[in-house]
Amino acid sequence: MPTMSQQRLTVLRWYSSLRLYFLLSVILIQVGSYMLGYSLILPRSYLTMLSSEAEKAASMPFLDRLISGLVGLAIAYTPYVGIGWMSYNLINVGELGLISPLQSIVQLFYLVILTAFPIVDGTLITTVVAVSRINKVQLPSGFLRTALTQYAVSIGISLILFIILISL
């Protein structure tokens, strides 16, 4: 039977390798679902749509852009990101505000990266704590505090960068 320190080391290795795998998977899933969503909801010329949407969004007051951007961010944090994004646009709410300037491929890529880190960190922290409780494995001292700090930092950085992104 493995000792407690071996179990802790196994948990840490498992956590770090899964974090990288999950992160890459979430990014690939998000990119794929966004692209599928855009191929389904954008039958007209993409460049024409981008220019007209950017003009509309630029004339919106900052507070309106910020509020609708935060709504878009909340939808982007759902596990099925692409489906949430498609639903948001299919009901034409996305035409109202900040979602419009986010409809360029580069900004969309940034949004994918910004939402991937908090999704992965939150999922992994929950999974590690649940598995350790079920298997009665004691986590290394300070692990949960460090993991939650990392999660809070990733959410904070994502929100700050998102606000910068939407205010451009």
Whereabouts are the PLM-identified features?
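Perimembrane loop-to-helix junctions flanking transmembrane segments
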Residues: R44-M60
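Terminal transmembrane helical module of multi-pass membrane proteins
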Residues: D121-L168
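N-terminal signal-anchor transmembrane alpha helix
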Residues: L9-R44
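Membrane-helix interface motif
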Residues: M35-Y46, G82-L98, I125-V128, S167-L168
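Alpha-helical transmembrane spans of integral membrane proteins, capturing the lipid-embedded, hydrophobic core
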Residues: R19-V31, P61, R65, G69, ...
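Pore-lining transmembrane helices
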Residues: E55-L124
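Cytosolic juxtamembrane amphipathic/interface segments immediately preceding
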Residues: P2-L18, K136-G142
